[in-house]
Swiss-Prot record:
Protein EC: 4.6.1.-
Species lineage: Eukaryota, Metazoa, Ecdysozoa, Arthropoda, Chelicerata
Species of the source: Sicarius cf. damarensis (strain GJB-2008) (Six-eyed sand spider)
Catalyzed reaction equations: an N-(acyl)-sphingosylphosphocholine = an N-(acyl)-sphingosyl-1,3-cyclic phosphate + choline; an N-(acyl)-sphingosylphosphoethanolamine = an N-(acyl)-sphingosyl-1,3-cyclic phosphate + ethanolamine; a 1-acyl-sn-glycero-3-phosphocholine = a 1-acyl-sn-glycero-2,3-cyclic phosphate + choline; a 1-acyl-sn-glycero-3-phosphoethanolamine = a 1-acyl-sn-glycero-2,3-cyclic phosphate + ethanolamine
Co-factor: note: Binds 1 Mg(2+) ion per subunit.
Protein name: Dermonecrotic toxin SdSicTox-betaIIB1aiii
Database matches in InterPro entries: PLC-like_Pdiesterase_TIM-brl
Keywords, ordered alphabetically: Cytolysis, Dermonecrotic toxin, Disulfide bond, Hemolysis, Lipid degradation, Lipid metabolism, Lyase, Magnesium, Metal-binding, Secreted, Toxin
CC terms in the record's Gene Ontology section: extracellular region
Binding-site list for Mg(2+): E24, D26, D84
Residue pairs linked by disulfide bridges in the UniProt entry: C44-C50, C46-C189
Tissues where the protein occurs: Expressed by the venom gland.
Localization: Secreted
Functional description taken from the UniProt entry: Dermonecrotic toxins cleave the phosphodiester linkage between the phosphate and headgroup of certain phospholipids (sphingolipid and lysolipid substrates), forming an alcohol (often choline) and a cyclic phosphate. This toxin acts on sphingomyelin (SM). It may also act on ceramide phosphoethanolamine (CPE), lysophosphatidylcholine (LPC) and lysophosphatidylethanolamine (LPE), but not on lysophosphatidylserine (LPS), and lysophosphatidylglycerol (LPG). It acts by transphosphatidylation, releasing exclusively cyclic phosphate products as second products.
Length: 273
């Protein structure tokens, strides 16, 4: 269960208390591709305040503590951080610079270049395939800085509802054949059909297909849509209301089929139920 748009530091505990075991936050860049703040901006989901924010490096410092065992702020349930990279707001020519900057800030403020025990997995949410240079830069930077081992903690996810074969082609260009999630969804203000979601799930379940390990639906607020997604077999849902998802998961139909992921579950492995 991914808490959606958790952009203020005080919202982290709020969403965890509602039952989320993952959080998504938005990263806003300046025109040069430097990550500045966690901030969504207007418009955003219905019924939500769009303007909450924090300085990105301060947010990382806090979330490091929240995901470090034995830290006073530690919350065991938080196992995944989804960075919603607002690259569509900057020139595609700056995507590489943005990838370098985010990698260095994670190295300095989250992983602390090997001196941090923060353990959450990281999901890089890229809005459009045209911004794939962000991924190349991110991986290049980890390599150049001597921390390629952190690649094991990082997954890729394209969130713009683009053609799945087009996404596969870009992953092929990048040489990525594992640690890939696929999102499908729309703002909670609108309804969305299931055609592309079903296609993504079919690809995930195709033997030998290496470009989708997990599929999640976003942003779900109605229990009926949560149930629909679970019946289709999604691996996760993003919601403004994690507590509603918890209630649905306790229903007789789902209680034996689904459970919340823990740190002992590998987010890059396909679930074979």
């Amino acid at each position: 269960i991914m808490g959606h748009m958790v952009n203020a530091i005080e919202q982290v505990d709020e969403f965890l208390n509602l039952g989320a075991n993952a959080i998504e936050f938005d990263i806003d860049f300046d025109k040069d591709g430097i990550a500045q703040i966690t901030h969504h901006g207007i418009p955003c989901d219905c019924g939500r305040k769009c303007t909450k924010k924090a300085i990105f490096t301060e947010y990382l410092d806090n979330i490091r503590q929240v995901t470090t065992p034995d830290d006073p702020k530690f919350r065991e349930q938080l196992v995944l951080l989804a960075l919603d990279l607002k690259l569509q707001r900057i020139s595609s020519a700056k995507a590489y610079r943005a990838g370098e900057d985010v990698a260095k800030k994670l190295l300095d403020h989250y992983w602390r270049r090997g001196n941090s025990k923060a353990r959450a997995y990281i999901l890089l949410n890229i809005p459009l395939v045209e911004d794939y240079e962000f991924i190349r830069a991110f991986k290049d930077t980890l390599k150049n800085e001597g921390y390629e081992s952190y690649n094991d903690k990082v997954g890729i996810n394209f969130t713009g509802n683009e053609d799945l074969d087009k996404i596969r082609d870009v992953l092929e260009i990048l040489g990525i054949h594992k640690q890939v999630w696929q999102a499908d969804g729309i703002t909670s203000c609108f309804a969305r059909g299931t055609e592309r979601l079903k296609e993504a799930l079919k690809k995930r379940d195709t033997p030998g297909y290496n470009y989708i390990d997990k599929v999640y639906a976003w942003t779900l607020v109605r229990k009926s849509i949560m149930r629909r997604s679970l019946r289709l077999g999604v691996d996760g849902v993003m919601s403004n209301n994690p507590d509603r998802v918890i209630k649905v998961l306790k229903e007789k139909e789902f209680a034996d089929k689904f459970r919340l992921a823990t740190y002992n579950d590998n987010p890059w492995e396909k679930f074979r139920g």
